[in-house]
Amino acid sequence: MRKAKLLLFLIGLSFYQIGLAQNINFILTSAGTLVNKEDSSDFVVINFEGKSKDEIFEEALKAVTMAYNSPKDIISKVENEMISINGTIPSCTVYRSLGIPIYFGMDYVIKLQFKDGKMRINAPYISRWFADNAPNITPFSGWLKAQSVFKNGKPNPKKQYTIDGIEGSFNNLLNSISASMFNKNKESW
């Protein structure tokens, strides 16, 4: 019984910690760009009350480093000012053509900028879009139009799974990094 109570307490505590982090939610537009769902801006600002920009930078650098297998290959930084993430998500979404699933991946750039008490996450930029069995597809916005992923500027309900895969890949990554920065128990392993 004590173990069950302890387990429930720890689960509740982890949800509380995650709840402290702001939910990051970028959505895909018909132009092939991502924007903040709340206000259609191309960035999200996360507040860190009472923290200096140097402290926030260090926390972000640790969180980003933990999120990748080989961080030195994808992270560029301007000390205490900016972190640039140049990554790849293979098979991030599936598109069905004549019932045949085609898996797509993407290369992307995400920039994090810092001020005292704040971190700005610029909307991810898709720098390369590719099928696992085909060469690069450019421009990404042209592919979205050609495949009717959007109709009249609105998501095509029949292709929503493609949009969800792209948005989910970025939002899950960024929310994981953000939650890691807010997690105060990471040192007690």
Name each region found by the language model.
Residues 1-24:
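Bacterial Sec-dependent N-terminal signal peptides
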Residues 21-189:
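Ser/Thr-rich, low-complexity intrinsically disordered terminal regions
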